Design a protein with these regions (language model features):
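N-terminal helix-turn-helix
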Residues: 2-91
Length: 91
């Protein structure tokens, strides 16, 4: 599996201020991790990819899951993109 590189949320928010909401920025960074090369993720791997604590990533994921932006596969223990993104993708 290839390596995926993301600028960490911590680095990104270190000196630049966009006036945005940090939690939203972090949640969107998580969603951006999912692609054809990485269609599913476990919490520890996502935490490393975005350079955030596992507890923070877990809370963000639970919020995204509650709104169907992410879905959990209990058999695999992995998250994938959820059904709420489908209508948005086809606009």
């Amino acid at each position: 599996m290839g390596s995926i590189q993301f600028q960490s949320v911590r680095e990104k928010s270190g000196t630049e201020t966009t006036g945005g909401v940090r939690a939203l920025d972090r949640g969107l960074q998580l969603i951006k991790c999912f692609d054809a090369g990485h269609p599913t993720w476990r919490v520890p791997d996502l935490a490393r990819a975005v350079n955030l604590h596992r507890a923070t990533v877990h809370r963000l994921i639970k919020t995204l899951e509650a709104e169907s932006f992410l879905a959990f596969d209990p058999d695999a223990g992995e998250y994938r993109l959820g059904s709420a993104l489908m209508p948005i993708a086809y606009l």
